[in-house]
Amino acid sequence: DYGGNVGASVDPKIAATWRITEELSLRGSASTTFRGPPQSLLAGKGTALSYVGPTASFKAIDTIGNAGLSSEEAFSTNIGLIYQNESFYASIDYWAFTFEDSFQTEGFNQLLGSYSANGCIVDGAATDSVVCNTIGAHIFPVAARSNLASTERIEVNWLNGTEIKTSGVDFKAEYTFSDVMNGAVSVGLDGTYGLEYKRDAGLDYTGSVVLAPAADLMGKLNYNAGPSFTSKPELKLAAHVSYETDAHYGGLVLRHVGEYDDLGAPARLPNLATIEDHTTFDVNYIYRGFDGLTLSASVVNLTDEDPAEARGDLAYDPFTHNAFGRMMKVGFTYTVMGK
């Protein structure tokens, strides 16, 4: 019980497994969850610099707490198959989530976009209307309400957003070859494929102004979908092969992100309309031959791949890709056993 506007919740969960054969099982679950807003969302103000399109520069974004936030709730379901024997494991699961009143903030670029789309500037003067005055109250200084390029600050509020529905499929398979040169070799694959991420129309703090239309964000960059919505590639997977003995472990991991679209890419830059798929390799080695001492070494992004090019001030998508390039790590762990 969080009290106040947040309230309380009883969140049941039901889960069942049917063992069809010794090796094949069917599983499923359904549950509800409840999350009360943290104190940082209920009061106070946080300020950060972000790129504001109409100004072509970074400006101050003030995020205002909302004492009227209610709880965030979700309903989740899952159904899947598992196959397992002494050497092989495989599973596939369908999952779905429905979120209600999720914690979101108004999109600052969406506010400015809506201000323009509603004709709030005519002949260099701000339009006096309910919608324009509601949106304009976010834009500072006041003079910027008649010239968005002169905007210096934008205020956005925490709010309970509209409904979100998302679903997808998780999959995993691994086969182990035992007794290979006094060790074991494992090969495997696991990943997820997103089917949908449907969001109802995004509204402002008052609930009277549409800032973004309803949309399915799966498979999109979502650069202008608001700060609460990041890129959502449909496919992410990792494949591995490893060899392990009592003293040694060596492994190679392939990481792959499928391509996804940027619906807002400018026509003059058609190469940005699709963010290309991206594949990297990691190599890991562990030595456990010393008493109490473990040595390890890794190379991340072995082939030094650059992130896929994308629209934005970083020229890549930081929510999906990494710009660090090849990285090498070494480490050790020494265990002292007490009596």
Listing of model-derived features with the role each one plays in the protein:
Residues 1-17, 23-72, 74, 89-91, 96-146, 244-257, 261, ...:
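Surface-exposed extracellular loop regions of Gram-negative outer-membrane beta-barrel proteins
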Residues 1-5, 33-37, 86-88, 95-101, ...:
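Structural signature of outer-membrane beta-barrel domains
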